[in-house]
Amino acid sequence: MTSLNPVLTIGYQLTEPMREHLGLSRSEARRRAIELLEMVGIPMAKSRIDDYPHHFSGGMRQRVMIAIALSCDPQILIADEPTTALDVTIQAQILEIIKRLREELGMAIVWITHDLGVVAGMADRVAVMYGGYIVEEAPVFELYANPKHPYTQGLLKTLPNLEGQRAERLKSINGQPPNLNQKPLSCSFAPRCSQTMERCLVENPVLENRNNNHKVACWWNP
C-alpha cells in the first residue's frame, strides 16, 4: 500500500498500465478502473477515482493496489506480503477479497508471506525457504501435518497453542539467519539445527522427493 505515488490520483495510477499495455483509450481505461475499484470493494468508486492515496485508509489503499495488480488481467498474481501492517479485521477482509477474486477470475496466486496462518488458509501447496533456498515443498495439509525439515518443524513450533489449561512459553529458533552475501557451501541452517550431522557442515543438500510429492532438502532423514 506504500507503493502508491502520493502525488498522483489513484485513477491515474490505475489507468496508466491499462493504456500502456492494453491500448485502451482514456475513457475506456477510466471506465475499467471504476469497475476494478468496485470489484475490490471501494465504496462510491466513481466519485473516489480522482482522490489521492492519502484520502484512503491503509486497508483501502491495499484494495487499490490489488485493483492495479488486476488491471491487465493477469493469469498469475504475485502477492508479496499483501496483509503486512494491517490489523486483524482488515487483514481478514483483504484475504477474503483475494480469495473471491481468485475464484471469479480463475487466476493462480503466488503468496509470499511469513504468516503461517495465512498460508494455512490460502495456499494449496507450500514452499518453505531459508537463506534464499527452498528447503521443503509439499501440499499444505501434508506440510502442516508432517513437516520433515528441521526449519519447518521449528517454524510450526513457534505458533502459539490456544488449546490446553495453561499458557506455555512460545518457542523460538536459536541462532541468527545466515549472511546472504556469501553463497553457502554447506547447509545454511546447520548452525541453528538440532539435527546437524557432519555431512551438513560440508555439503549443501538438494531438494529431493521423499513421498507423496513431498520434497525436502535435508541430509537428516529419520
Across the structure, where does each feature detected by a protein language model lie?
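ABC nucleotide-binding domain "signature" region
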Residues: 28-40, 155-158
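P-loop NTP-binding/switch modules centered on Walker-like glycine-rich loops
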Residues: 78-82, 86-168
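Short catalytic/signature loops enriched in Gly
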Residues: 43-46, 137-222
